[in-house]
């Protein structure tokens, strides 16, 4: 199937506050809830199907475009729990 991949860098101040993504977890980008297909320490990738690409503003996003990102709170809690269990 055809889909689009978007990779986003997590800003340092957000990473420092414990905002993280987990693979198969969710993240909201510009108001669109998406599934994370790849998660790194400071970046994550989402795959967007053609319908979503065409019916949202993703078709207008270019490299370097600022977007609104809302992280899944469960990922933040899991990261915090892992920190305390060390």
Spans of features found by a protein language model:
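Conserved loop->alpha-helix
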Residues: 1-86
